[in-house]
Swiss-Prot record:
Function: Involved in oxygen transport from gills to the various peripheral tissues.
Family, as annotated: Belongs to the globin family.
Protein name: Hemoglobin subunit alpha
Keywords: Acetylation, Heme, Iron, Metal-binding, Oxygen transport, Transport
Modified residues (N-acetylserine): 1
General remark: This fish has two hemoglobins: Hb1 (major) and Hb2 (about 5% of the total). They display the Bohr and root effects.
Family matches, as SUPFAM superfamilies: Globin-like (SSF46458)
Species per Swiss-Prot/TrEMBL record: Cygnodraco mawsoni
Length: 142
């Protein structure tokens, strides 16, 4: 679980990086479909699933909107992300293992875009936070 120190670190990092959240989402999703091509199956209804395509950019923006929501609900991720969990479990039917894959890609992108801000301490806190987000999103699968 997230300590008060972790929560403060996530909020501080988010304040800095949120201005670039659309680019982070696009890059993370683009990276995910290249490095983990099996994830493309969830987007097979899109006409263009190439990195940086309009659909990838738009969905990356949605993903980062969800992360922004999670930051605002950091004290109770399970309740705060309930609707997103329902959507991913019952409508989109996303395998929850993919949340961890995307989290890894988000961490890589933030590390490359914000090397100064992405200290080891920020890394640990953000990793724990994203793991909590993945757990909250997987809640409705049980």
């Amino acid at each position: 679980s997230l300590s008060d120190k972790d929560k403060a670190a996530v909020k501080a990092l988010w304040t800095t990086i949120s201005k670039s959240s659309d680019a982070i989402g696009n890059d993370a999703l683009s990276r995910m479909i290249v490095v983990y091509p099996q994830t493309k199956t969830y987007f097979s209804h899109w006409p263009d699933v190439t990195p940086g395509s309009t659909h990838i950019r738009d969905h990356g923006k949605k993903v980062m909107g969800g992360i922004s929501l999670a930051v605002s609900k950091i004290d109770d991720l399970k309740t705060g992300l309930f609707e997103l969990s329902e959507q991913h479990a019952f409508k989109l039917r996303v395998d929850p293992a993919n949340f961890k894959i995307l989290n890894h890609c988000i961490l890589v992108v933030i590390a490359t875009m914000f090397p100064k801000e992405f200290t080891p301490e920020a890394h640990v806190s953000l990793d724990k936070f994203l793991s909590g987000v993945a757990l909250a999103l997987a809640e409705r699968y049980r």
